[in-house]
Amino acid sequence: MRVLDEIAESPFLISPLNPNSTANGYRWVDKCHGFLHNTVLVAASLFFVAYLAYEAKKSLSKLSNRRSYIMIAYYGCLWLVSLLNLAWCCLQGWECTPGKEVVWNLLTLFTTSGMLFLEVSLVAFLFQGNYASGAEALTRTFLISGFIVALDLLLKAIFLFGFGVPLFIDNNENGKTFKWGLWIIHKLLLTGVYGMVFLMYNSRWREKLPARPAFYNYIIIMFALYSLYLVASAFTANNAHFGFWLYGIMSVCYHALYLPLLYITFLADFFQEEDLNLENVYYSEMKDAGFFDSDWE
């Protein structure tokens, strides 16, 4: 335990929130968690939004060709959540700015709820087997996701604004044990869900899930992420500095890398398949027009 605490206190690693940093005249990028923490978050989220914007015209064209209701809705949700996440990453200084507690809590609440909605939607989609494009499949997926996320958001709002539990502000020591107990339960539930899907992929029930390596790798990554989140929450609840440091690392990884991972897992294959379909169409049209007749002579 002592070795872990020494690692967590290293000046080269992401530091815990410093409530006095706003009084030192630092720039916004240095506030609260430090330069490294904020720079990684802003750079990663900004790069991903820029990539989405760069590919937007091509992506919208492919979505309109396939007319998949699920993909169109999911792509729109991804854009909305990506912009929310970018705002959250850029406004890290609000976490330790007096008078910004309420607006920071609201921003964090809606950002994390949006990301959780994408997570739950993808898991719900996995249980439907292959790609579905009907309005019924879209409605069923989003109803399940919406109900779970609405319940999660409601409970967090009650603890935040009803009981004053500082779920998203780490420099407030009031209710610390209770706060981290809530996070342990939250991460335990998510770890359990991904663990269950992982076991299904390695059992006779795997035939009910999409036979795509990308989905399997996604489940492994998310299971590992929430397992580490759970360990970090348990350490922090027991006043171990290592736990707080590890939780910060996992938070950076989640907000910086989750949305790109989701895009690669769920949407990139869809767009790639559309390219292959278009190539097959072009090939068929050229073959019908006699472009390849000389090859048979």
Swiss-Prot record:
Localization in the cell: Membrane
Keywords assigned: G-protein coupled receptor, Glycoprotein, Membrane, Receptor, Transducer, Transmembrane, Transmembrane helix
Topology with respect to the bilayer: Multi-pass membrane protein
Residues annotated as glycosylated: 20
GO cellular component: membrane
A Pfam family reported for this protein in Swiss-Prot or TrEMBL: Tmemb_40
Protein name per its UniProtKB record: Protein CANDIDATE G-PROTEIN COUPLED RECEPTOR 8
Transmembrane residue ranges: 34-54, 70-90, 107-127, 142-162, 180-200, 215-235, 242-262
Organism this protein belongs to: Arabidopsis thaliana
Keyword Transmembrane helix: yes
Function description: G-protein coupled receptor. Plays a role in plants and microbes interactions.
Recorded family membership: Belongs to the UPF0359 family.
Gene name of the encoded protein: CAND8
GO terms (BP aspect): G protein-coupled receptor signaling pathway
GO MF, one example: G protein-coupled receptor activity
Main location: membrane
